[in-house]
């Protein structure tokens, strides 16, 4: 795809071109997808209007599987940058677009490739298991990749006495250690959204809604997971709610974007999002949202499809190594 990329786009990280306010963006996006043989992949944490126009909505594991099997020539990954990298690794011959290159991830940022390389050298004989929320460069240093949906299954596949470095999500690794009896070395990284959930906030909601079932993502801290009735990935939460129609109330400790899919699939159920902890004297948004996921907008998706940019590439020498642990996971 030959694209004339403007300097100002590169500086901003996305295509910033005016769009007629009278334009039906949802309809135009679907039209462009048809013209360009494109599909839109969206994570559960994106805003509802993006999930509504997506060809496929899922968690990291489901999105990776979809990227590996699609016949479409172009993928628009509405999530964060590492997800777009994963799409490119699994479908190197396809065009992968990330609507805003600024859509990073605090968890991925907590583990730099050069730091992991040094840590590996300090711990010879250890296998490296990396959470999918990592850059391609980190995956290239990894023996196997996991998601919150399959972490236990993957770790169980290793001999019990295998020496393992697990990262970058400390909370997920700590939980897996606790239920498997292992003693993996844990990288001290975390998701800035899930780190802010507290037991106190859950208890307050539980007092107001005593019949509500508490569901928490595995990226939450150990005390939060300890009071949760259901622990798992976003897909785990969604499936649980669908499979238990007798339950009419849930308390949800994860990014608020999942509420759209939960409410769409379970219209007769009430979901209460857990508010995050705000430090004393803190200012700003007291919301359980990932600002990176919310960088994806209809306007950016429309412009990205129209102009064919920003595309995501992975250096061949990194891609060759990084794709192996992902394929092993799948």
Describe these PLM feature segments.
Residues 1-252, 258-259, 264-330:
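Active-site loop-to-helix "anion-binding N-cap" substructures in soluble metabolic enzymes
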């Amino acid at each position: 795809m030959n694209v004339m990329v403007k300097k100002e786009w590169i500086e901003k990280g996305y295509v910033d071109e005016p769009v007629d306010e009278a334009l039906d963006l949802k309809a135009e996006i679907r039209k462009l997808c048809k013209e360009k043989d494109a599909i839109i992949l969206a994570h559960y944490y994106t805003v509802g209007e993006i999930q509504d126009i997506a060809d496929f909505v899922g968690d990291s594991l489901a999105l990776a599987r979809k990227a590996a099997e699609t016949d479409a020539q172009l993928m628009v990954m509405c999530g964060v940058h590492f997800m777009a990298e994963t799409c490119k690794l699994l479908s190197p011959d396809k065009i992968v677009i990330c609507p805003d290159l600024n859509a990073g991830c605090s968890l991925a940022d907590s583990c730099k490739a050069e730091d992991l390389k040094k840590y590996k050298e300090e711990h010879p004989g250890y296998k490296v298991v990396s959470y999918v929320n990592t850059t391609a460069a980190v995956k290239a240093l990894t023996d196997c990749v996991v998601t919150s949906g399959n972490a236990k299954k993957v770790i169980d596949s290793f001999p019990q006495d295998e020496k393992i470095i697990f990262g970058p999500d400390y909370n997920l690794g700590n939980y897996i250690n606790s239920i498997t009896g292992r003693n993996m070395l844990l990288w001290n990284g975390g998701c800035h959204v899930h780190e802010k959930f507290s037991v106190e906030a859950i208890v307050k909601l539980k007092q107001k809604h005593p019949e509500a079932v508490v569901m928490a993502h595995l990226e939450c801290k150990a005390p939060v997971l300890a009071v949760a009735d259901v622990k798992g990935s976003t897909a785990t939460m969604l499936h649980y709610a669908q499979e238990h129609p007798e339950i009419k109330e849930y308390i949800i400790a994860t990014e608020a974007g999942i509420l759209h899919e939960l409410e769409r699939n379970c219209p007769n159920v009430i979901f209460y999002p857990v508010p995050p902890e705000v430090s004393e004297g803190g200012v700003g948004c007291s919301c359980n949202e990932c600002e990176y996921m919310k960088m994806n907008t209809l306007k950016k998706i429309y412009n990205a499809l129209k102009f064919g940019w920003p595309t995501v590439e992975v250096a061949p020498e990194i891609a060759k190594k990084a794709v192996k642990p992902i394929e092993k996971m799948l």
